[in-house]
Amino acid sequence: MEASTSLLVLVLAAAAFAAGTVTEAAGDGCSAGCDLALASFYVTPNQNVTNMADLFGIGAANYRSLAPYNPNIPNLDFINVGGRVNVYFTCGCRSLPGSPGATYLAGAFPFQMSRGQIYTSVAANYNNLTTAEWLQATNSYPANNIPDTAVINATVNCSCGDASISPDYGLFLTYPLRAEDTLASVAATYGLSSQLDVVRRYNPGMESATGSGIVYIPVKDPNGSYLPLKSPGKGASAGAIAGGVVAGVVVLAAIFLYIIFYRRRKAKQATLLQSSEDSTQLGTISMDKVTPSTIVGPSPVAGITVDKSVEFSYEELSNATQGFSIGNKIGQGGFGAVYYAELRGEKAAIKKMDMQATHEFLAELKVLTHVHHLNLVRLIGYCIESSLFLVYEFIENGNLSQHLRGMGYEPLSWAARIQIALDSARGLEYIHEHTVPVYIHRDIKSANILIDKNYRAKVADFGLTKLTEVGGTSMPTGTRVVGTFGYMPPEYARYGDVSPKVDVYAFGVVLYELISAKEAIVRSTESSSDSKGLVYLFEEALNSPDPKEGLRTLIDPKLGEDYPIDSILKLTQLAKVCTQEDPKLRPSMRSVVVALMTLSSTSEFWDMNNLYENQGLVNLMSGR
């Protein structure tokens, strides 16, 4: 059996073990953790968000997944020294080394020590979220005898709430106090002055603390609501939330990091894809071609069948992009930069990804080597030398976000917008309904819908894609929340629940964008604190005494008067159905495609009676 398959078995076994044991009583301190906690990271000079994401096990390449928890930061690429960034993590119930009965709540993050490092220097990396004394207490290495190559647990304490204090709060921020802070001032910062007595009860003995120590503050989720406390399981300490699956993820992360570290030193060869124009299986080649510093352990593409995808050399990609020059750079995403190139007579877009983005690289490679559709961007090939590279067909007309809000683009006609919506819906319908397994994109937004020279749309950027078995409707709860703020439905942002209806919700937001050309989050001033979601704005218009007039205030001014208001009203109603809070009430992408076909057709001879499951949606679009 291939190494990758063995690793998968190990992962599944560990997950089953964690899920089965984590909710059992583990001692007097706690018996279970919770899916989600936040840490307030104080920004000092020479720090950036990628560093913070790396310290908390999120991965530097995934730093943009912090955006939903930081609505007051307009751009995570520019953070102010002296400010604070909220970082999410799993709050687990853990035991002190050698004392399984002594338990505590904390996030634990594998930290690779280097020569000369001590617990004090590790604590300094976390900016008072932990201490040298606490690191020594939660690790097995003596402070004066830490091996140079040791991987320790960097532990950050957290809270899951307490039912005896309040059932209204289930999400907490670990906040390290600074000289200017008191418990009362921090509570006021988070709008909890009226609940100061409750905050005090969560932080006994901290009322007079200033300048040092940690306090736990109830905070709102990305949708602006307080998460209620989940009912603790039997044997759980007050306020503990059952989080078996997520705790399993923490265990797996540690296992995975250990495997990476071990194979970095021991790997002798790697399994790589064989270049071929035809469908091929993987072969093995000598490590003379790919060194451990380039690819660690087994090739990350092991086990993937590549259908007509070419393995390019680094030299060929470098030559085609003038050494990945600024002049060839055409974009920058959360997982890497994109460069224009001409390869073997074809225009191409090359995404250059950091080695730490292996998960996203694999996800995208796996989807696009198995799934082929007119409305999905086409993968030409890949490269795994020096960095991770994906080579796509070049779509020369930019993305939908640029056409709606960028400079130098001709306004999109209403007919073009409907066609773009239909093309995008067809791409999503294909991955939801016609692939085995079913794929869930998880990051549908206007920036990930590419427009070709004929103004036809293709869905792109599959780096966050999840998959599920045929007939499955959702992924396990506790999935790490990634994606883009403003496009995430409530069940995903709050609980990590993943199903195809996550994409349906995001697509509904894109429909609102097509109507209004506004961003998913609309800021009425330069201050990001004064903002509203596009979903809210349209619901407000639809609930007004005259919905058509309400909508006119939101319609893209670039359309002028060149639009049928009835068509806009119907598309708005479709978007509203897609963005319903209850995922069960949202239509499938199959029904959305039918509705858009009806809306885009001028024919009176559509036979809608035999099409798909949502006849009411069809009737809505056809005006019946």
UniProtKB/Swiss-Prot annotation:
Gene3D superfamilies referenced in this protein's UniProt entry, alphabetically: Phosphorylase Kinase, domain 1, Transferase(Phosphotransferase) domain 1
Q: What are the UniProt keywords, alphabetically?
A: ATP-binding, Cell membrane, Chitin-binding, Disulfide bond, Glycoprotein, Immunity, Innate immunity, Kinase, Membrane, Nucleotide-binding, Plant defense, Receptor, Serine/threonine-protein kinase, Signal, Transferase, Transmembrane, Transmembrane helix
Q: Residue limits of the LysM domain?
A: 173-218
Disulphides: C30-C93, C34-C160, C91-C158
Q: Where in the cell is it found?
A: Cell membrane
Name a GO CC annotation attached to this entry: plasma membrane
Q: How does this chain sit within the bilayer?
A: Single-pass membrane protein
Q: What happens when the gene is disrupted?
A: Suppression of the defense responses induced by chitin oligosaccharides.
* Domain Protein kinase residue range list: 324-599
Q: Which InterPro entries match?
A: CERK1/LYK3-like, Kinase-like_dom_sf, Prot_kinase_dom, Protein_kinase_ATP_BS, Ser-Thr/Tyr_kinase_cat_dom, Ser/Thr_kinase_AS
What is known about its processing and modification? Answer: Autophosphorylated; induced by chitin and derivatives.
The EC number(s) attached to this protein equal: 2.7.11.1
Keyword Ribosomal protein attached: no
Q: Which residues lie on this side of the membrane: Cytoplasmic?
A: 262-624
Q: Which SUPFAM superfamilies match?
A: Protein kinase-like (PK-like) (SSF56112)
Broad class of the protein's primary localization: membrane
Name the job this protein performs. Lysin motif (LysM) receptor kinase required as a cell surface receptor for chitin elicitor (chitooligosaccharides) signaling leading to innate immunity in response to biotic stresses. Involved in the resistance to pathogenic fungi, probably by sensing microbe-associated molecular patterns (MAMP) and pathogen-associated molecular patterns (PAMP). Involved in the detection of microbial peptidoglycans (PGNs) and mediates PGN response. Plays dual roles in PGN and chitin signaling during innate immunity.
Q: What is the protein name given in its UniProt record?
A: Chitin elicitor receptor kinase 1
